[in-house]
A protein has these predicted regions:
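Class I SAM-dependent methyltransferase SAM/SAH-binding core
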Residues: 41, 47-94
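Short glycine-centered segments of the SAM/dcSAM-binding site in methyltransferase folds
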Residues: 39, 130-131
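Conserved class I S-adenosyl-L-methionine
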Residues: 1-35, 49-53, 133-159
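Short alpha-helix
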Residues: 156-169
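A conserved beta-strand element that flanks and buttresses the S-adenosyl-L-methionine
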Residues: 104
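Short catalytic micro-motifs in class I SAM-dependent methyltransferases
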Residues: 107-108
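A short glycine-rich, Lys/Arg-flanked "PGG" loop and its adjoining helix->strand segment in the class I
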Residues: 116-128
Length: 169
């Protein structure tokens, strides 16, 4: 099974139980230091879990990408008519022209199998002085526990922050 199919099959129920982490998402947006007028890229946005928290930070524009058509369909319904958001069903690695002040991956980093390529692409897409944020709504052990039955071609799990950060040196 490929990653697009995996997430398309789960899109309809992806948000079940997600309201309990709203405060966590707000804290992530705050700690990301998103300032009014900045441009933000929400990578692997899924059904738009971070949208409200990002909107509250008052950026000038939010581009949200995901390669699952069904995830993007659900996300689009959440921001229908809101010109702040531009949603695209595409792969991060297809992006070439745009640049951003903040790039965030929320609850999706384990699904990027080639982390070294993520490092390269983020470096291309970040404006000077920009920030890249990888965040999750749960601890590493819980996330890895949730992924024990996920096919290995869909997730790599999370290493410790120290181990993951070696790619970014």
């Amino acid at each position: 099974m490929d990653i697009r199919t995996y997430f398309n099959q789960r899109a309809a129920h992806w948000d079940d139980g997600e309201q309990s982490v709203d405060q966590i998402r707000r804290m992530i947006a705050f700690l990301s230091d998103i300032q009014e007028g900045m441009s933000v890229l929400d990578v692997a946005c899924g059904t738009g879990a971070m949208f409200e928290a990002l909107r509250e930070r008052k950026p000038s524009h939010i581009t949200a990408v995901d390669l699952s058509e069904k995830m993007i369909e659900i996300a689009a319904r959440k921001v229908e008519g809101d010109s702040l958001f531009e949603l695209q069903c595409r792969d991060l690695f297809e992006m070439t022209q745009e640049t951003f002040d903040r790039i965030i991956i929320y609850n999706a980093y384990p699904h990027f199998m080639e982390k070294d390529k993520v490092v390269q692409k983020v470096a291309e897409l970040l404006n000077p002085g920009g920030r890249f944020i990888v965040a999750h709504g749960a601890c590493r052990e819980k996330i890895n526990g949730c992924h024990t039955n996920v096919p290995k071609e869909i997730t790599s799990g999370l290493l410790s922050a120290k181990e993951e950060s070696r790619l970014w040196e």
